């Protein structure tokens, strides 16, 4: 029996894989690995697929120096800069996605963390959306206190998003203005406040396969059931502008491994999907069962209409409101 088959049987039986086993699994034949990851997805999650959307609620002028990010004030990029959008603009985005059956809508803001005034304004916006629209609300506002998490939850937010981005080992190579532990603390506070959490990373930041496994194992250890997988889109003007994007085989291998790490949740494909020739079709048969649809924060995405058509062809049942 191959290593892939052996670990598949264990996971289907409710077991888990060690770090060393996952590293070895990452070197197994790709087709068998992807088929096994898809079998795990079917066993634990069926054909349910989760689509969400995001809106860039405040853009640019971020104090942080994340080397991949177009919104960092440390780099000269062509990103549009604007302050926090109005209640009506944020509501319009929610209504647009709600009308298309999208289950979740997230407001994302640039910046290291929110001020008390920012939180008050955003909570008013979340309440305004909740009063006029039935879409589920997510929030992504950087590092955040437990008190602010509690305020967001009271305003109608059900899930907080905060990516670890990369492994503890690689993090200082990517960002020096905040730490891996800062992000872990934010996640823990969100969980303590009663919010669900969505957390993953960006692939293609110079990390190793071991780094990827370490990061997703850290996330899984927190009980998180929504794990985004982003693929770097190099942005002109950033230090990572000349990074070589990952190839299809490596992308598929990563997604399959995440499914082995988290058998029963949503492996969510996010940034970088628009650069794939098939817009993620192979990945959605290799363990992934969720995606961000529409545009990303500063890059183009795949339209909701295209996603719904493709997922129907693949036999998925998209979670709708």
Curated annotation (Swiss-Prot):
It holds the Pfam family Radical_SAM. GO terms for biological process: biotin biosynthetic process. Pathway: Cofactor biosynthesis; biotin biosynthesis; biotin from 7,8-diaminononanoate: step 2/2. It catalyses: (4R,5S)-dethiobiotin + (sulfur carrier)-SH + 2 reduced [2Fe-2S]-[ferredoxin] + 2 S-adenosyl-L-methionine = (sulfur carrier)-H + biotin + 2 5'-deoxyadenosine + 2 L-methionine + 2 oxidized [2Fe-2S]-[ferredoxin]. It is an enzyme of class 2 (transferase). Homodimer. Belongs to the radical SAM superfamily. Biotin synthase family. HAMAP family: BioB. This is Biotin synthase. It comes from Akkermansia muciniphila (strain ATCC BAA-835 / DSM 22959 / JCM 33894 / BCRC 81048 / CCUG 64013 / CIP 107961 / Muc).
